[in-house]
């Protein structure tokens, strides 16, 4: 359906794999979402020791585009090291650069993020940075050569939806690389809204894994994303300040 770098994504829903109650629920949610992209925190995969538990042991990663992230990194060097671990383990089709700058809000550090992207691009990675909804930063990263930008809707795990749709629209309208909305999506309505703004895709985790029924929510998110994309392509009617009758005025002469 669209590409990030040389990778073809069949679904506009990218699914995070953490926080699921158990492996069965995780597997069913993945199936219901119809995604072909799975993201995961490298530090949770125990890639450096195959004898330790692996939360994706029940998933055949060969069926998916693997999208590891550098969650847990607070510096550029930490993020680069995490990316290299994933790459050496052979589970790094593309990398989500995530460098947290504040422990309370979990907002990304723009300066460290830029440095990570610069190094990983030089090493040949397909790079997708997680950023705040900062148009100028998105533009600078695109100039650097990133393959997609991933602005947040609102802080990670808050489920607040799109806090600043105007800024998000600025990023989408000015980008020539895919825009994947990441973090803060709480419901299919939020996901649909982001897609109606013109986003290329949505990355979800908590909104699905923490739902009362993650499998149903995975399907609901898939439908919301598809509906939002169709709406964007169809083109909504303009917003007006005066009413306009939907029925024609012809035939009223007899009144």
From Swiss-Prot:
Pfam assignment, any one: ThiG
CDD domains reported in the protein's UniProt record: ThiG
Location in the cell: Cytoplasm
Active-site residues annotated for this sequence: 96
Pathway of action: Cofactor biosynthesis; thiamine diphosphate biosynthesis
Residues noted as binding 1-deoxy-D-xylulose 5-phosphate in the record, renumbered to the chain: 157, 183-184, 205-206
Alphabetical UniProt keywords: Cytoplasm, Schiff base, Thiamine biosynthesis, Transferase
UniProt keyword Cell division, yes or no: no
Top EC group: transferase
Enzyme Commission number: 2.8.1.10
Subunit relationships: Homotetramer. Forms heterodimers with either ThiH or ThiS.
The protein's role, per its UniProt record: Catalyzes the rearrangement of 1-deoxy-D-xylulose 5-phosphate (DXP) to produce the thiazole phosphate moiety of thiamine. Sulfur is provided by the thiocarboxylate moiety of the carrier protein ThiS. In vitro, sulfur can be provided by H(2)S.
Family note: Belongs to the ThiG family.
HAMAP family: ThiG
The name this protein goes by in its record: Thiazole synthase
Species of origin: Staphylococcus epidermidis (strain ATCC 35984 / DSM 28319 / BCRC 17069 / CCUG 31568 / BM 3577 / RP62A)
């Amino acid at each position: 359906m669209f590409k990030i770098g040389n990778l073809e994504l069949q679904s506009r829903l990218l699914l995070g794999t953490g926080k699921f109650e158990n492996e069965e629920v995780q597997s069913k949610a993945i199936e219901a979402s119809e995604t072909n992209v799975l993201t995961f925190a490298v530090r949770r995969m125990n890639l450096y020791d195959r004898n330790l538990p692996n939360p994706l042991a029940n998933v055949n990663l060969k069926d998916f585009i693997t999208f590891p992230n550098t969650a847990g990194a607070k510096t550029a060097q930490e993020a680069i090291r995490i990316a290299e671990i994933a790459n050496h383990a052979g589970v790094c089709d593309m990398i989500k650069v995530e460098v947290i700058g504040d422990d309370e809000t979990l907002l990304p550090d723009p300066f460290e993020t830029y440095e990570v992207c610069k190094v990983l691009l030089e090493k040949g990675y397909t790079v997708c940075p997680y950023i705040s909804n900062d148009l100028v930063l998105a533009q600078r990263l695109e100039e650097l050569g990133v393959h997609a930008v991933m602005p947040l809707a609102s802080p990670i795990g808050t489920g607040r939806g799109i806090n600043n749709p105007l800024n998000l629209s600025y990023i989408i309208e000015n980008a020539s690389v895919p825009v994947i909305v990441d973090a803060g999506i709480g419901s299919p309505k939020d996901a649909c809204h982001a897609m109606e703004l013109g986003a290329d895709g949505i990355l979800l985790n908590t909104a699905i894994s923490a739902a009362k029924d993650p499998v149903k929510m995975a399907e609901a998110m898939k439908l919301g994303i598809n509906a939002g994309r169709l709406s964007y392509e169809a083109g909504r009617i303009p917003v007006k300040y005066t009413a306009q009758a939907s029925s024609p005025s012809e035939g009223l002469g007899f009144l």
